[in-house]
């Protein structure tokens, strides 16, 4: 009789142990301390780089020399886009034209700090080599003549009437061109208060070698 009781008790204990094991196996496992839930990290937005004209001019001059050791500049201009309105003498896009007298050709170089898809890639790039016309030689100038930067030209133009235009339109776009003027025999910054050189509210002409204000126009 005692043997039967012990058998019943032992069977009951084994049944309880088996049930406990089954419950433990079927319950959801918790995440171990070593397992980490993957998290998504936001990629930081790449900001555009705004350059002054002289900064880009130096970069483009170096690239032009690799193309042709005798390459000399004969024109540079800024461009407008959603990243820069040209104020303070800075832009994300500058284009320079360099000619090789021995090749009698020129190339357009672009200095870009833009992040826009429809603009030139970041850095300095160049276009195709093209034969230049008879007017180009008279426009060529030596790179060392550029002393006053575009931000200085902007500040000078502001003092001579540009600030009044800014009061009327704080987002006033500003464009810059750099050219040798055979008549003045000087390298000139021309500051255009407008969205294009043909349609501007005011123009300031500054000597790019001395920084001196020369004249205003419309």
Where do the language-model regions lie?
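Bacterial N-terminal signal peptides that target proteins for export
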Residues: 2-13
């Amino acid at each position: 009789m005692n043997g039967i009781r012990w058998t019943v008790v032992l069977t009951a204990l084994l049944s309880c142990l088996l049930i406990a094991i089954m419950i433990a196996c079927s319950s959801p496992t918790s995440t171990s301390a070593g397992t980490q839930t993957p998290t998504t990290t936001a990629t930081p937005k790449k900001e555009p780089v705004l350059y002054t004209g002289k900064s880009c001019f130096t970069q483009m001059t170096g690239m032009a020399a690799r193309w042709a050791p005798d390459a000399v500049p004969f024109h540079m201009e800024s461009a407008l886009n959603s990243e820069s309105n040209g104020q303070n003498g800075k832009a994300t896009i500058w284009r320079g034209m360099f000619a090789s007298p021995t090749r009698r050709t020129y190339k357009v170089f672009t200095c870009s700090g833009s992040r826009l898809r429809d603009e030139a890639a970041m850095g300095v790039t160049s276009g195709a080599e093209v034969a230049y016309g008879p007017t180009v030689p008279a426009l060529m100038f030596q790179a060392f003549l550029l002393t006053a930067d575009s931000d200085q030209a902007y500040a000078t133009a502001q003092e001579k009437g540009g600030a009044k235009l800014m009061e009327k339109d704080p987002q006033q776009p500003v464009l810059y061109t750099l050219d040798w003027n055979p008549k003045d025999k000087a390298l000139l910054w021309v500051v255009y208060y407008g969205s294009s050189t043909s349609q501007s509210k005011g123009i300031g002409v500054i000597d790019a070698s001395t920084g001196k204000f020369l004249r205003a126009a419309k």
